[in-house]
Amino acid sequence: RDGGHPDPEAVHLINEAERLAYADRDMYIADPDFIPLPGKGVATMLDPTYLKQRAALIKPNTSLGKAQPGDLGEVPLGSYTGTEHGTSHITVADKYGNVASMTTTVESAFGSFHMVDGFILNNQLTDFSAEPRDETGAPLANRVSPGKRPRSSMAPTLVMQPGANGEPDALTAALGSPGGSVIIQFVVKTLVGMLDWK
């Protein structure tokens, strides 16, 4: 904290951590019904030893530039990042304490350009990687397959205070964001600003 102002060193560390996280996301994460996460799944990707190795790549005065994905074993998948637009986020609360945090998208502006009964149909399938393989010829985790869901960056978030028994108790914040593939970064930076740089 710096009197409520972002600390440049903290901003740098968050940016570099996000570069590393996105490199792994682009390499390994897709519809889990089609592409399993490497190793033991989430436990492998969040293994403390692995995360320490990734964190050691962050230098205090130098940017990683384009981060490379970590080595999580034999997973013959490549990476691709495309642009996304056409997203909105709303958060609503009522007098009874019910809260909803919802991100909605038609993907690109005007979605698929088709309207049914006043609703614009989305073109969410463009969240799949445009190419089925990366530059080396490795198949992409987020490639198109029949019945498969495209990867999404939407991150509607509820922040709760823990209760006495560890269960969620009082609501601290409800948020989300538009922004395509950088929604996750916007949500992280908003949370850090709210919770750490009050």
Language model features with spans:
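Alpha-helical support elements that line or immediately flank enzyme active sites
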Residues: R1, G176-W197
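Intrinsically disordered, low-complexity coil segments
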Residues: G3-H5, F34-A43, E135-G137, Q161-L171
